[in-house]
Amino acid sequence: MDTEFLRTLDRQILLGVFVAFVAVGAGAAYFLTSSKKRRVCLDPENFKEFKLVKRHQLSHNVAKFVFELPTSTSVLGLPIGQHISCRGKDGQGEDVIKPYTPTTLDSDVGRFELVIKMYPQGRMSHHFREMRVGDHLAVKGPKGRFKYQPGQFRAFGMLAGGSGITPMFQVARAILENPTDKTKVHLIYANVTYDDILLKEELEGLTTNYPEQFKIFYVLNQPPEVWDGGVGFVSKEMIQTHCPAPASDIQILRCGPPPMNKAMAANLEALGYSPEMQFQF
């Protein structure tokens, strides 16, 4: 056999092996890099501490807390619509644990944010009131029963009261920021006064950026003199007007104070929404 032919064949074999080796190495490197980029920080069994890096007072009793994750590419690892358990100290120095829903998604790498309404007698509210930049918060999770896949429903109706807006905002963001998810979102958000409305700027941003997919109707118990939203409590008529009608491909989400949740459950039942069409956070 021609010696030159054998040498050429050997070179081709070696080149093929080299290319295959490089491809495997590149694939492994990509996998490792991707895994590193998507480092999940939550532990469902054990509390982990995260450093407070920013605190922005939104009103006299509401603040946004920004917590740093271990690396700039870390993610919290929180499924859409689920929450975390936060541990702190009350005014007597006793441990207290309470659930909260971050307003950030896993697309917000390197950090997570909590918008907290602090009540005068709230035990965990005391802990957040006392928190300063540089302090750490103990967090465990994820927690919750809500599960969602893009396009699972044609539309969501959302009934939120007060700080119950946080899981709604998280779900709405996840839907609207996913270009392949065409689910429509109809939100009714109830508060006592105009100043009680949480995430107002962010919600208005969603209506501006997604006008055909996201609709919001505000309801105030004590509205200002000039007001074009709802007045009083969320009624059956408001739900009929601003939420999708009962159907197998819609779901109504509820999150608010216990009296509101109870009243909304009764309103929804009277309007023909089956238990399968509803979910309460």
UniProtKB/Swiss-Prot annotation:
Phosphothreonine: modified positions: 166
Checking InterPro entries in the record gives: CBR-like, Cbr1-like_FAD-bd_dom, FAD-bd_FR_type, Flavoprot_Pyr_Nucl_cyt_Rdtase, FNR_nucleotide-bd, OxRdtase_FAD/NAD-bd, Riboflavin_synthase-like_b-brl
Look up the record and report any one GO term of the cellular component aspect: mitochondrial outer membrane
Motif window: AKR2A-binding sequence (ABS) required for mitochondrion outer membrane targeting: 34-40
Q: Which GO terms describe its biological process?
A: electron transport chain
What's the impact of mutating residue 78 to F? In cbr1-1; decreased stability and decreased activity
One Pfam family hit: FAD_binding_6
**One Gene Ontology MF term:** cytochrome-b5 reductase activity, acting on NAD(P)H
Keyword match Flavoprotein: yes
Q: Where expressed (tissue)? A: Expressed in roots, stems, flowers and siliques. Detected in leaves.
Q: Where does FAD bind?
A: 129-144, 155-187
Q: Which segments constitute the FAD-binding FR-type domain?
A: 45-149
EC number of the protein: 1.6.2.2
Q: What is this protein called?
A: NADH--cytochrome b5 reductase 1
Report the source organism. Arabidopsis thaliana
**Gene name?**
CBR1
